[in-house]
Every structure is written in structure tokens, then in C-alpha cells.
Curated annotation (Swiss-Prot):
The N-terminal AAA+ ATPase domain and the C-terminal winged-helix (WH) domain are both required for DNA binding. Keywords: ATP-binding, DNA replication, DNA-binding, Nucleotide-binding. This is ORC1-type DNA replication protein 2. The keyword Methyltransferase does not apply. One of its GO terms (biological process) is DNA replication. Disulfide bonds: none annotated. ATP binds at T69, G70, K71, T72, T73, Y211, R223. Involved in regulation of DNA replication. Dissociates the MCM complex and inhibits the MCM helicase activity, suggesting that it may function as a helicase loader. Binds to both specific and random double-stranded or single-stranded DNA. One of its GO terms (molecular function) is DNA binding. SUPFAM superfamilies: P-loop containing nucleoside triphosphate hydrolases, Winged helix' DNA-binding domain. The gene is cdc6-2. Interacts with MCM. Pfam families: AAA_22, Cdc6_lid.
Amino acid sequence: MKGDKRRDIRDILLHDETLFRNMNAFDPDYVPENYRYRESQMEALAVCIRPALRNGRPVNAVILGSCATGKTTAIKKIFEMVESTSEGVVCCYINCQLHTTRFGIFSQIYSKIFGHQPPETGVPFSRIYQTIMQHLASEKRALVVALDDINHLFYSKNANKVLYDILRAHEVFEGVRTGVFAVLSDIEFRYALDKNVDSIFIPQEIVFPPYTREEVFNILRDRVRVGFYPGVISDELLERITDHTMDTGDLRYGIDLLRVCGNLAEADASPVIGEEHLERALKSTGPVNLIHTVRTLNENEREFLRILADAGEDMTAGALYELFRESTGSSYSSFNRIIEKLEFLRLIDTRLTGKGVRGNSRILIPRFSREDLRRCPGF
């Protein structure tokens, strides 16, 4: 029996037939060749960058829209077009989930300009900043920085510093022309800025509305055509996947469902994706927003969530900290910072109980089920 099982596993690993023509088509970072339904937003982005191509200053923009509405893809597409047109504009896309510090942001800008990262030690931030701005001034190049998920810079309390450093550079370095595309889903974003930043960051608002059902179906069908060989999945099954995608409100869920269905069908040595593969995929896939957020957490933050989920009930901060300290050895101040971050990311809620010192004892409440968390990669 064990020998048969080993042969089954070996067959799966060595099987050289595939349903996938291009598995990358189902990756979260994939930029499709056929990018539809965002022509007006692309035009608005182009209008913001156009002055930089004419030796002027780019127009700042706030790019608003819920998750998976095409914001990131639109920016990457327009940046590719600009860079293929002119060397006079540096277009730098930065994922603020991954880079949350002032040094991290400007290291990405430095890398974009010079082709390599600056030294991580021994070089002060001021020198890196000066090198960037002197290059822009001497080469007469404009800089446009897209700060994707800029809310993470607000959590790390670096948003105002970063925006100030970019947008007021011309006051110190004559001739420098800079602009920022701030990408987020919070329409109240600009009101969180310091006055000295708010006075210079007067952005155009570019809104990415949710896709309609017809648009979602067509986008998923485009991915199917690129990612699978012909005949792998029927339009009827794609309609069902579209319905589930609309229920979640997140296009990434549908794209991920296609990938999981394809993998399950391959494991069964099936030439097509069937109803049974979709049913199994639905049971194995967690909420897409939770999955994408959890991917950005470090190991201590994930351990915090594991402990809270394993408890099976709401916990006081004190009780959770005792378990967290035993597991990680972290200090209470680190524990508190994790609470603040996870609450900011809407993974947990907190509620004062009125007990404890000065009545500040807190109950920690997860905003997800244990089962959903367990279905996230890394748990």
C-alpha cells in the first residue's frame, strides 16, 4: 500500500503533461498584455505625467479604488509606456507593504536610477538622498514615484516624511522635478497629512470603480486564454467562478480559483477542469483579502494570530501576551506594536473592558475564523 502511494506521488511530480500554457497568468503580480476597461484612468495617469515629458513638473495624483480594481496594473502599464518613450523621466513603482521606512523607499528610488541598491550600513540617509537629487538635477530628469498601498507608510508613521522629502526636493536642489502617485482605498487619505505636506500635495483624484460582472467574466476569460490550453475549462464553469468572484468583491479570488482548479485537475490527471475540481478549490481557498494581508506579516505577527485563532474565543491582551511571550520571548512593547498594526490592517478588533489599571484592560477579537486563517499559505 505504501509503495503504491509513493508511486502515485512520483507520478504527480514527474508527470510532464500540463493544462497550463502560462502559469504566470494566474500570479498576483502578472501584468496582462490585454488590459481592458481602464482606458479613462490610463488617460488620466498619462495627463499627470505629460508635463514631465515637456521639462515640467509631474502632477501629483491620488489613485483610489478597492482591492483588485486594476490600479497597480494601470500604473505599471503607463510607466512602461513612459520609459519606452523617454529617458528623461524616472518612473519608480514601490510596494509600501514591503518597504515601510524612509530608507527603504529611497533605496528603491536609488536602485531604479543607478541599477543597484545603496549600501545598507555606513552611508547616512542624507547622502543617499543627496545622490538621488543631484543626479536628477544634473541629468535634467523628472521623478515620478508610485507609492502603492501607501496606508502602510501611515502605519509606520513615515508617510509625511517620505512625501515631504520627495515633493519639496526642488527647494534644496534647483531644477529637480518630482511627483507622487499615492495608491490606496481610503478616500479620506489626504486629510491625514501634515500641513507642510498638504500645502504642496494637491493631487488629482483618479478613481477605479469596481468591475461589473460582465467585465469580471471577460477578464477571467482573458486569463484562461493566456494561462490554459484551449478546452481546459468550459464557459459554464467560468460563469460559476465569476459568481463566486462577485460574491467576494475581489478579482484576485477568481484568478486564484482558476489556478487552484487547474492544479487539482492536473493532480487527477484530468484533461479538463470539472465541477468536482471547483468544489474542492472552494473548500481549500481562504478569503483573498486575508491571504494577501497575511503574506505581508513577519513571523511574530503570524504567531500572534495563530495563538488568538487557536484560543477559539476572544482573549484579554494580558492572557494573550503570556502565551505570546512563552512562544516568542518578545517584550510587551513589541506585543503592543503588533496589536496596533493588526488592528490597523483590520485583522483584529479591540474593546476596552473597563477593568484593570485605569480601566484599560482590552479584549482582542479576531475578524476572521480559525478555519480561514488555516487556509492561508504559511499557516
